[in-house]
Curated annotation (Swiss-Prot):
The lineage of its organism: Bacteria, Pseudomonadati, Pseudomonadota, Betaproteobacteria, Burkholderiales. InterPro entries: Lipase_chaperone (IPR004961). It is a single-pass membrane protein. Belongs to the lipase chaperone family. It is found in: Cell inner membrane. May be involved in the folding of the extracellular lipase during its passage through the periplasm. This is Lipase chaperone. Its main location: membrane. HAMAP family: Lipase_chap (MF_00790). The gene is lifO. It comes from Burkholderia vietnamiensis (strain G4 / LMG 22486).
C-alpha cells in the first residue's frame, strides 16, 4: 500500500478528534461570555463568576511556578468557577462539567499525567483545603473514565448523523457509559444534552418520514417544539450557540475557505479573539494530522522490515520522538497507534 493510500483511512480515523477539539475551543468561547446570559442562574453561567474573579485568577496564575504555567490553548483565559451548595460541597450541576471541559481544551498538548496535574492545580486554586476539593477530584476521575470509554468505541464513537437508528444506538450506548462511569453525576453532566439529542433525533425522524407531506412535517415539527418547556429552551441556548458555531465551521471547512475567511466569518459570531483561536487550533490540528499520516506511513515501513519486536519498538519510538517534538505530541501519537491497532 502506498503512503498516499495509507494516509486516507488514517485521516478519517483522526478527523473526529479534530472536531472534538474545535468543539472544546468553541465551548471555551461561550463560557468566557461570548453570548449574553444576563440574569441567568450563576450555576448555569460560570463565565459570570469567572469575570468577577478575574483579578484573583490573575494573581493565582502569577503565583504559579514556571512548570505549572497554563498550556498554550488556555493562555489568556481563566477556568470557570466550581459551584458549591449551601453546605460547602460540590454542587451537582452542569457547571462542574464546564470546568473540566475547559481543562480538556488543552488535552492534545499534555500527557495524561500532565492533564491530571493541571486539573488538580485548577481545583486547588478554587477549593484548596475544603470538603469540595476531594469531591471534585473524584468527579474528574469519573469523567476521565467516561472519556476513556468513549475513545475505546469503534472509530471513537463516530456515527452516521443522518441515520436515525444508528443515532439511537449511539445515544443509548453513550447514556449507558455515562451512567456506569459517572453514576449520579450522569444527569447533571449530560441530562440536558441527552434530552437535546433525543429532541434532535425526533426532529430527524419527522423530516425523513416519507409518508408525511411537507405540511404534515411542518405541523409535527411545530408540535414537537411546543412540547419543550420555556425554561428548558433557555437552558439549551448555550448549546445551541455552540452547535451553530460548529455548523458554521463545518460549512466553512467544506467550502474550502481560507483561514482568513474562516476568521472573518467567525469574528461576527464569536468575536475576534475566539475566532483567531479557533483558526489557530484548526491549523495546528491539520498540521498534526498531516504529520501523523506521514509518521504512520514510515511506521508501516518499519513494520514490514521483519525486525525483532525489540528493534521494531525502538525504531518506532525514535521515529515518534523525531516527528512529534512538542509536549504531549508523541504520547498522543502512541495513543492513536493503539487505537489503530485495535481497529485492525
Amino acid at each position: 500500500m502506498s503512503a498516499q493510500q495509507t494516509r486516507a483511512p488514517l485521516l478519517r480515523r483522526i478527523a473526529p478528534y479534530g472536531a472534538a477539539g474545535l468543539a472544546a475551543i468553541v465551548g471555551v468561547a461561550i463560557w468566557s461570555g461570548t453570548g449574553s446570559q444576563s440574569g441567568a442562574d450563576a450555576s448555569r453561567t460560570p463565565a459570570n463568576a469567572v469575570a468577577a474573579d478575574g483579578a484573583s485568577a490573575a494573581v493565582r496564575q502569577a503565583a504559579l511556578p514556571a512548570s505549572a504555567a497554563l498550556p498554550a490553548p488556555l493562555v489568556g483565559s481563566s477556568a470557570p468557577r466550581l459551584p458549591l451548595d449551601s453546605g460547602g460541597h460540590l454542587a451537582k450541576v452542569r457547571a462542574v462539567r464546564d470546568f473540566f471541559d475547559y481543562c480538556l481544551t488543552a488535552r492534545s498538548e499534555l500527557t495524561a499525567a500532565a492533564l491530571d496535574a493541571l486539573v488538580a492545580r485548577e481545583i486547588a486554586a478554587q477549593l484548596d483545603a475544603t470538603p469540595a476539593q476531594p469531591e471534585a477530584l473524584d468527579v474528574w476521575r469519573r469523567y476521565r473514565a467516561y472519556l476513556d470509554a468513549l475513545e475505546k468505541l469503534p472509530d471513537g464513537g463516530a456515527v452516521d448523523k443522518i441515520d436515525p437508528e444508528a443515532l439511537q444506538r449511539a445515544l443509548d450506548q453513550r447514556a449507558s457509559i455515562a451512567h456506569r462511569t459517572l453514576g449520579d453525576w450522569s444527569q447533571p453532566f449530560f441530562g440536558a444534552e441527552q434530552s437535546q439529542q433525543r429532541y434532535d433525533l425526533a426532529r430527524l425522524r419527522i423530516v425523513q418520514d416519507r409518508t408525511l407531506t411537507d405540511a404534515q412535517k411542518a405541523e409535527r415539527l411545530a408540535a414537537l417544539d411546543q412540547q419543550m418547556p420555556a425554561d428548558e429552551r433557555a437552558a439549551r441556548a448555550p448549546a445551541e450557540r455552540q452547535r451553530a458555531a460548529l455548523d458554521q465551521i463545518a460549512q466553512l471547512q467544506k467550502s474550502g475557505a481560507t483561514p482568513d475567511a474562516v476568521r472573518a466569518q467567525l469574528t461576527q459570531s464569536l468575536g475576534a479573539d475566539v475566532a483567531a483561536r479557533v483558526v489557530q487550533m484548526q491549523q495546528d490540528d491539520a498540521s498534526w494530522q498531516s504529520r501523523y499520516a506521514d509518521y504512520a506511513a514510515q511506521r508501516a515501513q518499519i513494520d514490514a522490515a521483519g525486525l525483532s519486536q525489540q528493534d521494531r519498538d525502538a525504531q518506532i519510538a525514535a521515529l515518534r520522538q523525531r516527528i512529534f517534538t512538542k509536549p504531549g505530541e508523541a504520547v498522543r501519537a502512541a495513543a492513536f497507534d493503539r487505537s489503530a491497532a485495535g481497529t485492525r
